Amino acid sequence: MKKKWVIRLLWLLVLAVAAIIFWFSSQNGEDSTNTSSGFISFLLRLLVPGFEDKTNKEKKLILSQLHFYVRKGAHFTEYAMLGASLRLLFHVLNLRRPILWAWIAGTLYACTDELHQMRVDSRIAMWQDVGIDSAGVLVGALLVTLWLWHRRKRKRT
């Protein structure tokens, strides 16, 4: 009974992460840019002393320089979360080669995400994002694998 509860919870986690990714992909180009810019501004105010004292022109320049990297980092991170949750689910389901299945499922979701973005106003599909997303899935799955291995190793000693 406990295992069924864990499986349901992990399915819910996978679906929640997929829904968050879908929500971000559903934002039109302007909203997506505003979300990214707001996040970057928040981080800069938090981490860079004197950022608030810069002129608006200097702030915009810094934002534009970081925008690409933050967006790609967000892609990688959200898909790492998907890969980690898929890997945990497949572990509990006792699938053979759970890393491979997590990577395949996450990469297929990344492909459908790019197709979805083609249908959103002022958004385009960028197929190199699938590569970034796929790498994120793999890293997330590998991190969970390392955690499970470490946990199992500690139980033996």
What kind of feature is each model-predicted range?
Residues R154-T157:
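Short, charged juxtamembrane terminal tails flanking transmembrane helices
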Residues L9-W23, I104-T112, A135, V139, ...:
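Lipid-exposed faces of alpha-helical membrane segments in multi-pass integral membrane proteins
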Residues G83, R87, H91, V137-W149:
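Hydrophobic transmembrane alpha-helices
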Residues C111-I132:
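Interfacial helix-loop-helix junctions of multi-pass membrane proteins
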Residues F68-L82, W127-A135:
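Membrane-interface loop-to-helix entry segments
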Residues M1-T77:
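"…centered on the first transmembrane helix and the immediately adjacent amphipathic helix/loop
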Residues V6-L9, L93-W103, R123-W127:
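Membrane-helix interface segments
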